Structure formats: C-alpha cells, structure tokens
C-alpha cells in the first residue's frame, strides 16, 4: 500500500461505560459510576460481547461522561486508573472521556453526552463512518448522543427511573444481547451482498 491509498472509513461500536461495560452503583433508583477500581466490576457477558463485535471488524470505543471530576468530587487519576485497567482487560481501541461538570455547574462543553463531541472526535481520529456505527448505552443521554452523531442506537434497559427522550433503534437486555443483535444484522447484510 502506498501513501496515496485511501482506506475506506471504519465502523465502530461506541459503548457507554457505566451500566454497559461495568455494573453501576444504584442510589435512589439512579445509576452512579464507581469511584475507584475496587468498585469497578465488569458485567457478565461483556468480554464475550467485545470479542463478537471485534470479530465483525468494529472498533470498540468507550464514550463516557465522568462529570464528578469537573465537579471536584472525584479525582481524574481515579478515572484514569480505571480506564488503564479496562484497556488491559478488554479489546477496547480507545476511551473517550468527558470530564466536564456540565452547564448546570458552569462547565459547558460539546463533548458531554447527549452532545456528540466525543463521537465526532473519535470519528476524526480513527476515520469512522458514523452512519455505519452504533452507540450502545443505558441512559437517555447515550441514545440522544448516538442520534446526534448520526449513529444507530441500542438501548440497554435496566429499568432505571429515568425516562428516555427518544426511542432507540433497538433494545437489548445487556451488551451480549446487543452484540447478538448486531451479529444478526451483519448476517442479514451479508446475505444481501
């Protein structure tokens, strides 16, 4: 391959972290992120799901809001420690993290989900075709972020009290179920070509 060769855009699975990859901490019916590695527990089926998705040639990109850092209640180093460990455990290609506290806390940005900034940044870095990619998440912010970036969306429904603002393209019980759904879609696409 020479320098003039243009590679086709790649596809990605954008994964929310808490509630998709790891078990969130639930307080008053709402999910919260773990604050240290000792609280971080990878959910059952996640390693297998990642292998299935990688087998179809998708990049795996974690896109996570960690606003407690911007709000001063969690050290950035704690989040980075968790992400370093996560990259050793799973075939994740990149972790995109928004550390901003959010507009309510005087820390607005374009990367905090539901804004699509993290997905746009990853798409530029990795040459990702967003229209051929998926955003998988367990909260309304994830679904809206996926739509805002032009991705297909899969909602993992854990029965939180928080309601969705938009209907996702698909629903699954967990990441392995989402991977199996994508596998079925891939097989249908292969049958058409």
Language model features with spans:
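Active-site flanking residues adjacent to catalytic metal/cofactor-binding acidic residues
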Residues: 15-17, 64, 137-138
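Substrate-recognition element of Asp-dependent hydrolases with the DxDx(T/V) motif
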Residues: 46, 50-83, 92-101, 146
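Anionic group-transfer/hydrolysis microenvironments
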Residues: 18, 67, 159
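Conserved protein kinase catalytic core
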Residues: 22-24, 29, 71, 144, ...
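Active-site neighborhood of HAD-like aspartate-dependent phosphohydrolases
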Residues: 2-59
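Pocket-edge positions in alpha/beta enzyme catalytic cores
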Residues: 34, 38, 71, 110-111, ...
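Residue-level signal for short segments within beta-strands and strand-turn junctions
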Residues: 23-25, 99, 157
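Asp-based, Mg2+/Mn2+-dependent phosphohydrolase catalytic module
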Residues: 2-11, 77-94, 103-135, 139-193
């Amino acid at each position: 391959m020479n320098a003039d060769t243009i590679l086709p855009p790649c596809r990605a699975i954008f994964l929310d972290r808490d509630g998709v990859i790891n078990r969130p901490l639930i307080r008053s019916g709402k999910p919260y992120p773990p604050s240290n590695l000792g609280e971080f527990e990878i959910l059952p089926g996640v390693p297998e799901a990642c292998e299935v998705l990688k087998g179809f040639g998708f990049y795996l990109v974690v896109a996570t809001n960690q606003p407690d850092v911007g709000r001063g209640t969690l050290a950035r180093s704690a989040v980075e420690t968790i992400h370093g460990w996560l990259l050793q455990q799973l075939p994740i290609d990149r972790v995109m993290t928004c550390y901003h506290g959010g507009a309510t806390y005087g820390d607005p940005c374009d990367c905090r989900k539901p804004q699509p900034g993290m997905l746009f940044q990853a798409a530029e870095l990795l040459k990702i075709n967003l229209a051929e990619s998926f955003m998988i998440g367990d909260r309304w912010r994830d679904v809206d972020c996926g739509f805002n970036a032009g991705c297909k969306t899969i909602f993992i429904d854990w029965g939180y009290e928080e309601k969705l603002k938009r209907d996702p393209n698909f629903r699954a019980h967990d990441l392995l179920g989402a991977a199996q759904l994508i596998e079925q879609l891939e097989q249908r696409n292969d049958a058409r070509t």
